From Swiss-Prot:
Species whose genome carries this gene: Chlorobaculum tepidum (strain ATCC 49652 / DSM 12025 / NBRC 103806 / TLS)
Glutamine amidotransferase type-1 domain span: 178-366
Reactions catalysed, as given in the entry: hydrogencarbonate + L-glutamine + 2 ATP + H2O = carbamoyl phosphate + L-glutamate + 2 ADP + phosphate + 2 H(+)
Protein name as catalogued: Carbamoyl phosphate synthase small chain
Entry function: Small subunit of the glutamine-dependent carbamoyl phosphate synthetase (CPSase). CPSase catalyzes the formation of carbamoyl phosphate from the ammonia moiety of glutamine, carbonate, and phosphate donated by ATP, constituting the first step of 2 biosynthetic pathways, one leading to arginine and/or urea and the other to pyrimidine nucleotides. The small subunit (glutamine amidotransferase) binds and cleaves glutamine to supply the large subunit with the substrate ammonia.
GO biological process: 'de novo' pyrimidine nucleobase biosynthetic process; 'de novo' UMP biosynthetic process; glutamine metabolic process; L-arginine biosynthetic process
Ranges for region CPSase: 1-174
Protein family: Belongs to the CarA family.
InterPro entries: Anth_synth/Amidotransfase, CarbamoylP_synth_ssu, CarbamoylP_synth_ssu_N, CarbP_synth_ssu_N_sf, Class_I_gatase-like, CPSase_GATase1, GATASE
Amino acid sequence: MQEIPAILVLENGSVYRGTAFGHAGEATGEVVFNTSLTGYQEILTDPSYTGQMVVMTYPLIGNYGITPNDNESKKIWASALIVREASNVYSNYESTRSLDATLKEAGVMGLAGIDTRKLVREIRQKGAMRAVISTLCDDVAALKAQAAAIPEMTGLDLVQRVTTGERYTVDNPDAKYHVVAFDYGIKTNIIRQLNAEGCKVTVVNAKTTADEVLAMNPDGIFLSNGPGDPFAVTYAIDTIRELAARNSTLPIFGICLGHQLLSLAFGAKTYKLKFGHHGANHPVKNLLSNTIEITSQNHGFAVEMESLPGELELTHKNLYDMTVEGIRHRELPCFSVQYHPEAAPGPHDSHYLFKEFTELMERLKN
């Protein structure tokens, strides 16, 4: 593989030089790091990474290639992938192509050969930053100015970029429940888990109205993960608030961005984390069962603990930084978690939440 020099310039002027793989050219976005050892395919195709360049802390990436069934959506959403070493050799009984070839076909840049430990420390200490990767320009001052001109994630509604254009249904022949899932950037494995729990899932556009949803006669509402600032997605917040007000026996379950939107709908506030939670090894305490769960996480915003209104009960707490990881309404059948119980990649400690959702639908259906 021919080595093409590439440069990464952060908005603060820090420079990292390496080589490009995948697509050569230019990429922009917010730089975040992910601590997962595996799962790069799922990470790249997770719509929640829209507008972000992902640094993998594990030093060797690409060694098991790309498999046909592990995408979390139909395309790569991350702006770029940054690694210490990109493996030219891949081996896995299901893999059909290399990471390099996949990125190249998708027009997505990869950057290898940089000191990722140094970059991660800088992000950890100074916060997630906007940046530019380029094989076309070596002018640091110009690239720094370009990075500084990238829109900040705060105030950015990216949901409209990733949501489905058309409603679609993923059926289960033995389905007992009909779930309407708002697509704010939904992952494939979430739909798969809902199917496994006996749900027919109708996936709808993020701007679908409460009237349209209720006309589908759902047994439950699911609020998906997604990218950007939850506070900017005002249409979703208003719809969730209306759904909860109009039907007090309709279960609502939110994950990640969906958790933040549900919290905002009931009057809580959100804020941007310094560098976010991105990885598959975050310990969370379940305050209801007094147990610890190892969780998969991917979010740059969080719900403000002090802003939780009286009707919302804190159910889960992050043991790294004590941030809100789960809430439930004290009277309405509404609950949510900040992390990803469906994992992909990650542990399966929290799969029980899908069962709790179906049990809630069963109880209120009868």
